[in-house]
Amino acid sequence: MLFRSKLLKSDAIIQAINAASVIQYMNQNILKKYFENVLGVSSLKIRIGIDFGDDDEVLWSKYGIDNINEVTVTSLHADLSSKLQNKASENSIMVGENVFSYLQLPDDLLSDIYIKGSSEEKDYYIMKHNSFNYKMKNFDWSKYLERIAHFESYEGDFQIKCYYLSENERRIPYYSEKALEKDTDIVYQIEASQSLLHKINSVEWTVSNSGIEASKEEELDYVVPKEAFTDEDNAVFRCKRHTAFNGLHYMICKIKAEGNITKNKYFSLYVNDNDLSKSYLKKAELE
């Protein structure tokens, strides 16, 4: 998959992952039924490969005359994205090492594949060349979308919303389409009809962080302590936090309501320090 834009690098990768995941979702849950039940033919088998190359490892070229031209890219990572696509199984997404390292994706979204014809020997690398051993992972797009709170939200249920504060203290909704900067104040809130909110008996907020920074600080998973909430926070079912670590992080809200109902709601939030993430990139130094 090839994306070229003026977005921040983290946001370009995030939007590539989001686009690929939605493509797979639409194919698996909508197009498949149409092809098989209406058209009476086999459904599409979509394979997607995503990789990322930094500015100094990608050469953009434009060929042609006047308004008849073509933009093309030359890069090891453009070739690797094609190879990743070839490695992908039907209706799956393969990502290169720079993708999951740059965003510090959680381990539970990533898995190894097996060497073709073997059920025991894993295939870790999309490329092995002396000192340049470049890893690949299968990306669990289904689980990823399940944890994006607004993706399959519907009326009549509890919804988790997240807002971040602008410079003028205005609340802006966050939709997992980009990374927030570190030290950004954010607010999670349960939203639903008043009749549904009145049925809530208790709420527990659990932070699930990912990445090298959170691991070093031993703050990967923890329940937000009761003393972190004001009476007003508890009354309106909100949780105030701030961003601190690179990675894709989850807020997990456990809601207990009348009728012996328990629901666990996820919200996915990206945080990225692009300067730090650049140090995670694997550079090709081929002879």
Task: Place the predicted regions along the sequence by residue.
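Catalytic beta-strand-to-alpha-helix segment of the class III nucleotidyl cyclase homology domain
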Residues: K6-I126, S131-K135
